[in-house]
């Protein structure tokens, strides 16, 4: 059913679609002299005041009910870029609110009133986790109305929801070995979101499965000799992986995830930057603060494999404002920890959704932060690539991935001569105590064809 919304023509510019720059939202016509008496700051104050009142009256939650939903929500962010003056005493706001399970609802608010006294007159659910319920259309009579979107899907943007099943192969090509060599290889493990079965493992030399206790990683430790030169190491996993949403983890040592490590500094300029971001966004909870930091990185860091990228050095990310997934998430973790929000790192591989077999383009990493009694999964570099999914990736990881290890500055026993392992996605190789390189490739087949 179409819902007609009469708007004042001389002052309205509606940008179609969801709260995003390419489709847009409602904006004001700044030529209308009568409207200039009200500022966007007034509209922001008005919507925040309405939401705060609803939260206070709702026992700490923004409660929303319609014919099919009964939601208790927490504020994530006000989209200040889409606050609009529709006409004299008529305004628009777009706000993200989240359930305790991490589902993020994009809600459209219409308000009436004057500065200091604005009241919400209409509230619509526009999106769920980045997928729209409706889009905006302009009719021949120059009024705007909403058109329902049926079966909106994230599939085309690389996301598989629910559960994914695939076989994953991790292959290492050993180089020429001139003397004794040692290698540390991550071993994927089962947890509450992924079930891992090793279906084959072929490796030369002496093998030992060792534990890295700080973050609970399992590592295959190999001792190799010259006769193992140019041989292959192959591990194949059968994987069943569930989509991840915010979850409780009672075993977490939160203080550990507030500490600095060599590539994840805490304090100093990171505290200054975090404070400025949080203050500008008027964020007053762990959830809204984390979203403000997430948005800052999306808006200011460029995904580019150039310079000294791939080390996960938050200082480099802060200076260069570019990098791959390691820079994006390291920068976030340093800012988050500096703001008093526990945050942690994991690495693995993202499995293509658009095909069912073939190569995987290297490792991928992601992060989690702690708020509202749960760990919230995020993927900022993917949110940066695909604007429509920036909401989804704040609170979710899709099913089509495998985690290989977690944590930074790993100290297994035995430890490499070079010291703690920064993070473990590709193997660490030492030949006669010096760093070596072994080409590593990933591949997959979806659907467990061997079962």
Where are these regions (language model features)?
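N-terminal secretory signal peptides
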Residues: 29-87
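Acidic low-complexity segments
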Residues: 212-214, 232-319
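C-terminal motif of bacterial Sec signal peptides marking the signal peptidase cleavage site
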Residues: 16-18
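Bacterial signal peptide processing site
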Residues: 20-22
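Hydrophobic/aromatic-rich core segments of domains that either
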Residues: 330-418
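Low-complexity, Gly/Ser/Thr/Pro-rich intrinsically disordered linker/tail segments
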Residues: 393-451
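C-terminal partner/receptor-binding element of secreted or periplasmic proteins
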Residues: 37-45, 118-154, 293
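Intrinsically disordered, low-complexity N-terminal segments that are enriched in acidic
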Residues: 149-242
């Amino acid at each position: 059913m179409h819902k007609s919304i009469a708007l004042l023509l001389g002052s309205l510019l509606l940008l179609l679609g969801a709260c995003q720059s390419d489709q847009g939202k409602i904006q004001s016509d700044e030529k209308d002299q009568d409207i200039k008496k009200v500022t966007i700051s007034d509209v922001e104050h008005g919507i925040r005041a309405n939401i705060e009142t609803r939260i206070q009256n709702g026992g700490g939650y923004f409660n929303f009910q319609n014919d099919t939903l009964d939601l208790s929500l927490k504020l994530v962010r006000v989209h200040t870029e889409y606050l609009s003056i529709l006409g004299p005493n008529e305004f628009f706001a777009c706000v993200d609110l989240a359930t305790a399970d991490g589902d993020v609802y994009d809600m459209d608010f219409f308000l009436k009133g004057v500065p200091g006294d604005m009241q919400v007159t209409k509230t619509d659910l526009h999106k769920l986790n980045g997928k729209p319920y409706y889009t905006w259309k302009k009719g021949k009579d120059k009024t705007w109305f909403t058109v329902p979107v049926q079966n909106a899907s994230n599939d085309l943007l690389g996301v598989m929801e629910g559960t994914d099943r695939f076989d994953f192969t991790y292959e290492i090509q050993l180089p020429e070995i001139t003397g004794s060599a040692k290698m540390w290889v991550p071993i994927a493990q089962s947890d509450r979101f992924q079930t891992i079965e090793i279906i084959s493992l072929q490796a030369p030399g002496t093998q030992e499965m060792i534990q890295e206790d700080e973050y609970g990683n399992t590592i295959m430790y190999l001792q190799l000799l010259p006769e193992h030169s140019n041989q292959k190491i192959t591990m194949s996993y059968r994987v069943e992986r569930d989509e991840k949403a915010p979850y409780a983890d009672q075993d977490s040592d939160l203080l550990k995830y507030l500490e600095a490590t060599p590539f994840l500094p805490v304090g100093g300029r990171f505290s200054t930057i975090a404070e400025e971001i949080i203050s500008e966004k008027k964020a007053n909870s762990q959830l809204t603060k984390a979203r403000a930091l997430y948005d800052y990185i999306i808006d200011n860091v460029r995904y580019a494999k150039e310079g000294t990228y791939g080390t996960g050095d938050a200082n480099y990310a802060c200076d260069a404002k570019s990098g791959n997934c390691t820079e994006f998430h390291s920068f976030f973790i340093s800012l988050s920890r500096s703001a008093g929000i526990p945050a942690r790192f994991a690495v693995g591989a993202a499995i293509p959704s658009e095909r069912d077999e073939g190569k995987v383009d290297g490792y991928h990493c992601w992060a989690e932060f702690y708020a509202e009694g749960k760990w919230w999964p995020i993927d900022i570099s993917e949110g940066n690539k695909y604007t429509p999914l920036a909401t989804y990736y704040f609170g979710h990881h899709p099913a089509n991935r495998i985690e290989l290890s977690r944590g930074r500055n790993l100290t297994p026993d035995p430890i490499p001569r070079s010291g703690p392992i920064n993070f473990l996605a590709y193997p660490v190789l030492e030949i006669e105590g010096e760093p070596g390189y072994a080409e590593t490739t990933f591949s997959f087949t979806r659907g467990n064809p061997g079962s």
